[in-house]
């Protein structure tokens, strides 16, 4: 009998996750359920059963998720949206017979999802380097943080402490010509005066003001149990869309140090960027990363192995193949049916 897997709202590259689970080497059959609030989402096109996901409050959304699992007899829930809230109600999913691919420790997920709390939790971790940073909520705090970082010789950037990916990321440029901002190619640069003016007298959500890291950036994709880190693939952003799966022992050791401290299970991703030859932490995603399918070119089928680990509690993984350069091109997909 086919196992039923549900993907709730997620990024479009999870389309590849479905393909990788569907073509698993064990020949197991799965039926894929996908929901998304946008009817044109490509994710809906790769589903056996697709539905439009409603816009709901958090309590209503959790109720919707539990009822969806019960109604469709979902065996495996592969969530991306509302991870923390789902983890808080994990027992409700288990009661309807659904296994959820998420860390069950909701407090840990909240910590990892907030960069300020995460950096505090990891500040004494051996082998892990953090950038110089401050958490601020007012324009005065921002100005002080900026000046202290400049005194250390750092170029300065900032982003929301609870932001995801590059949302809200800006680099502060001194003596910036407003015309350059208006007509230039980058919308990530901003003058310090403009930042302070925008914040004004407001008390805003936590902002992380930090040293700008100007060298190579890596995403480190990991598969683990709470006790063991099973697979690690560092993925280097070479240029543009070019990625390199790199046998980088320093980053492999860094991922081990993170796991030793946090004990995140299943899939997680560590993002770092180098400065002066030292890799420094940017963030940790306690879920499958958007570029995970590229790391699967190492021969490690991360999405399927995570599902197998959830179901059986154990997997065997061959050593990753490194030295793989990869990119991607656009491909047209005909929207065969619209909901």
Positions of PLM-derived features:
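A short catalytic or substrate-binding loop motif that flags glycine-/basic-rich loops and adjacent residues
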Residues: 150, 162-164, 212-216, 263-265
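ATP-binding N-terminal substructure of ATP-dependent carboxylate-amine bond-forming enzymes
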Residues: 1-103
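Residues that mark the start of a beta-strand
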Residues: 2-6, 155, 208
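Phosphate-binding site of ATP-dependent enzymes
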Residues: 182-258, 262, 273-274, 278-280
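Short, charged, surface-exposed secondary-structure boundary motifs
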Residues: 43-44, 61-63, 108-116, 166-167, ...
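ATP-dependent carboxylate activation and anion-phosphoryl transfer catalytic cores
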Residues: 8, 72, 238-253, 257-339
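Active-site nucleotide/adenylate-binding loops and adjacent lid/helix of ATP-dependent enzymes
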Residues: 109-206
């Amino acid at each position: 009998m086919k196992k039923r897997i549900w993907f709730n709202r997620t990024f479009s590259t999870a389309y590849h996750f479905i393909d990788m689970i569907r073509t698993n080497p064990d020949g197991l059959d799965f039926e894929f359920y996908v929901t998304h609030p946008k009817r044109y989402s490509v994710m809906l096109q790769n589903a056996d059963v697709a539905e439009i996901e409603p816009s709901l409050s958090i309590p209503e959304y959790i109720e919707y998720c539990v009822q969806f699992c019960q109604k469709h007899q979902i065996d495996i829930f592969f969530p991306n949206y509302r991870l923390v809230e789902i983890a808080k109600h994990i027992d409700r999913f288990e009661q309807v017979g659904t296994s959820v691919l998420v860390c069950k420790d909701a407090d840990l997920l909240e910590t990892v999802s907030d960069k300020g709390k995460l950096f505090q939790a990891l500040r004494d971790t051996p082998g892990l380097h953090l950038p110089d940073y401050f958490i601020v909520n007012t324009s005065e705090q921002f100005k002080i943080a900026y000046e202290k970082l400049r005194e250390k010789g750092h170029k300065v950037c900032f982003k929301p402490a609870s932001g995801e990916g590059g949302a809200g990321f800006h680099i502060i440029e001194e003596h910036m010509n407003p015309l350059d901002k208006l007509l230039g190619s980058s919308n990530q640069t901003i003058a310090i005066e403009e930042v302070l003016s925008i914040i004004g007298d407001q008390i805003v959500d936590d902002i992380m003001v930090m040293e700008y890291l100007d060298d190579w950036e890596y995403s480190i994709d990991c598969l683990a149990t709470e006790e063991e880190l099973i697979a690690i693939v560092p993925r280097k952003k070479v240029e543009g869309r070019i990625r390199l799966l790199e046998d980088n022992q320093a980053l492999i050791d860094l991922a081990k140090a993170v796991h030793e401290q946090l004990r995140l299970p299943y899939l997680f991703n560590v993002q770092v960027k180098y400065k002066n030859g030292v890799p420094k932490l940017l963030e940790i995603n306690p879920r499958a990363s958007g570029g995970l399918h590229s790391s699967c070119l190492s021969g490690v089928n991360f999405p399927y192995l995570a599902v197998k680990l959830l179901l059986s509690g154990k997997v065997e993984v061959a050593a990753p193949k490194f030295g793989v350069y990869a990119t991607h091109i656009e491909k047209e997909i005909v929207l065969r049916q619209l909901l």
